[in-house]
């Protein structure tokens, strides 16, 4: 009888490290570990040897950086997608791509099951499993963290120690960290108390604003149809742009976020994020839209931004709704071309200037100097018509 084969999403962290042995023992199955590279800086080296030593029979390392930037991050940026107006969705954006990569490997390896290391009260279980259902509904899905005997990260670490499984978490510093090029999420430990300020050791890449340089960094970012194409006049690939802005932003203490957010499963959670490049690019992109988008489009697009952010956060990336919103967003971005100049200083991003060949700002209409070309006399008739409805209402319903 042919053995079962399980493809697991493997990060090398605590949960997925012990999951290899746990699944192998429980299902007497071959384990294929799949790691996707989304630009994370840590835990990439030696992952294959670690997975094999832990019990995996196969390992796939999939470089997803380019599609992550071009097909996911840029789409979210153009949409202005910030979950609950704060979170740039780094982890959430990566999940559908990682899930797709896992499905691709599972089909290639003739696996019968898929497994992920998401908790039973988190968002990621929804994101992975909804994607699995969208792309490979015939494959059985396993979620060990919803059924195994471990009740805390401490008990998981005890299991890892017992079976000589190397992990980076410790009982003294039990942070759960997820990282990709668009940002880092940090949770667990003392961070679960919303009144406790994040300890400095929780932050992975950003300098404390208080310790950031005393001299500001000025940066110019150029966009073409809503997509960043250069930094300080130098044309770059998307991946290089994000890396450069992460470097500049982190040095200047940009992108530290601390929020209480509403999870898909109905609970509130306290999340710490580091997202220097995302913070800078969303700010710059929004300011360029202010300059180039017609008023009603600019205002309505705020609603689309929230809808798009919810789609990403809630795990329905592979949906007709997202495809439909992309069509709207892409049309709005046709004039979003130009340059934005910013100042990065001790945790803050300040606008210094912006320009575009499609700018709707007309200085001769806006100025209060002798160059003013606005017809002031036209305002009287406009106001009379504009306020006619309220005037009529007040005549029927006089104020008391």
From Swiss-Prot:
GO terms for molecular function: argininosuccinate synthase activity; ATP binding. The gene is argG. L-citrulline binds at residues 87, 123, 127, 176, 185, 261, 273. The lineage of its organism: Bacteria, Pseudomonadati, Chlorobiota, Chlorobiia, Chlorobiales. It is an enzyme of class 6 (ligase). CDD domains: ASS (cd01999). Coiled coil: none annotated. This is Argininosuccinate synthase. Its EC number is 6.3.4.5. It holds the Pfam family Arginosuc_syn_C. Keywords: Amino-acid biosynthesis, Arginine biosynthesis, ATP-binding, Cytoplasm, Ligase, Nucleotide-binding. Belongs to the argininosuccinate synthase family. Type 1 subfamily. Its main location: cytoplasm. It comes from Chlorobium luteolum (strain DSM 273 / BCRC 81028 / 2530) (Pelodictyon luteolum).
């Amino acid at each position: 009888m042919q053995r079962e084969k399980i493809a697991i999403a493997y990060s090398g962290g605590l949960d997925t490290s012990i999951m290899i042995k746990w699944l192998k023992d429980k299902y007497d199955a071959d384990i294929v570990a799949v790691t996707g590279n989304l630009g994370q800086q840590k835990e990439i080296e030696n992952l294959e040897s670690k997975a094999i030593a832990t019990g995996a029979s196969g390992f796939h390392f999939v470089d997803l950086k380019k599609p992550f930037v071009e097909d996911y991050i840029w789409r979210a940026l153009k949409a202005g997608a910030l979950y609950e107006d704060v979170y740039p969705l780094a982890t959430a954006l990566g999940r559908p791509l990682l899930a797709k990569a896992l499905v691709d490997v599972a089909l290639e390896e003739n696996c019968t099951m898929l497994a992920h290391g998401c908790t039973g009260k988190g968002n990621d279980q929804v994101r992975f499993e909804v994607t699995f259902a969208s792309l490979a509904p015939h494959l059985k899905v396993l979620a060990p963290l919803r059924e195994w005997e471990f009740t805390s990260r401490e008990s998981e670490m005890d299991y890892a120690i017992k079976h000589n499984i190397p992990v980076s978490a410790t009982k003294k510093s039990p942070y759960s960290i997820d990282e990709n090029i668009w940002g880092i999420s940090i949770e667990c430990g003392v961070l679960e108390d919303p009144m406790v300020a994040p300890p400095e050791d929780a932050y992975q890449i950003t300098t404390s604003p208080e310790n950031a340089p005393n001299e500001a960094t000025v940066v110019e970012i150029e966009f073409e149809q809503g997509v960043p194409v250069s930094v300080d006049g130098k044309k770059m690939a998307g991946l290089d742009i994000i890396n450069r802005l992460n470097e500049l932003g982190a040095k200047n203490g940009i992108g530290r976020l601390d929020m209480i957010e509403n999870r898909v499963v109905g609970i509130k959670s306290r999340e710490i994020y580091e997202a220097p490049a995302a913070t800078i690019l969303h700010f710059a992109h929004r300011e360029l839209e202010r300059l180039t988008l017609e008023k009603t489009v600019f205002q309505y697009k705020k609603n689309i931004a929230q809808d798009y952010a919810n789609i990403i956060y809630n795990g329905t990336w592979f949906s007709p709704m997202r495809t439909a919103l992309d069509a709207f967003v892409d049309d709005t971005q046709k004039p979003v071309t130009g340059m934005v100049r910013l100042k990065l200083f001790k945790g803050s991003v300040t606008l210094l200037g912006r320009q575009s060949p499609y700018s709707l700002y007309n200085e001769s209409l806006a100025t209060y100097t002798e160059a003013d070309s606005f017809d002031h006399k036209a305002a009287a008739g406009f106001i009379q018509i504009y306020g006619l409805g309220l005037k009529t209402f007040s005549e029927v319903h006089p104020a008391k």
